[in-house]
Amino acid sequence: MRILGIDPGLRVTGFGVIDVSGHQLAYVASGVIKTPTADLPTRLGTIYDGVSTLIREHTPDQAAIEKVFVNVNPQSTLLLGQARGAAICGLVSGGLPVAEYTALQLKQAVVGYGRATKEQMQEMVARLLSLSGRPGTDAADALGMAICHAHGGNTLNTLGGIAPALAKKGLRVRRGRLVG
């Protein structure tokens, strides 16, 4: 199964594509969709078009996207929600089922700790997908979203989803940190 993960943002929307076979995760692609400095409709159109292009290029079976959190600034929350909506429209018009997860669910599922830092997310994603380096923060969150969805959005450590992948690398998670 191929999963497209999306980390929505108005300026930068992260994406990550993985293949899943049982507990095996394989990296396919990741990156960002950058919007131009332009009016809001143009930026939303860029996100929609970018997601549509990703679907054509990578032919995913399913998609996962981060839920919007309420920010201190209501205007920022509204803009993020609109960017997320443009991405969801692209996913749905591409025929994909879309799952939604909170940032807390994402971090809990991938790192094993709901308050994990960006750096911990990047490190865990790199290790789980056997990447030579850490992906950028937006791409790491999007890849993490795909990983989270691959394992049903649950806490992978307690379900054994992440444990086999880490054990093969001589690692485990303890108090939100990789040890090995």
Curated annotation (Swiss-Prot):
This is Crossover junction endodeoxyribonuclease RuvC. Homodimer which binds Holliday junction (HJ) DNA. The HJ becomes 2-fold symmetrical on binding to RuvC with unstacked arms; it has a different conformation from HJ DNA in complex with RuvA. In the full resolvosome a probable DNA-RuvA(4)-RuvB(12)-RuvC(2) complex forms which resolves the HJ. It holds the Pfam family RuvC. The keyword Nuclease applies. InterPro entries: RNaseH-like_sf (IPR012337), RNaseH_sf (IPR036397), X-over_junc_endoDNase_Mg_BS (IPR020563), X-over_junc_endoDNase_RuvC (IPR002176). Mg(2+) 1 binds at residues 7, 138. The lineage of its organism: Bacteria, Pseudomonadati, Pseudomonadota, Betaproteobacteria, Burkholderiales. Its EC number is 3.1.21.10. Mg(2+) 2 binds at residue 66. It comes from Burkholderia mallei (strain ATCC 23344).
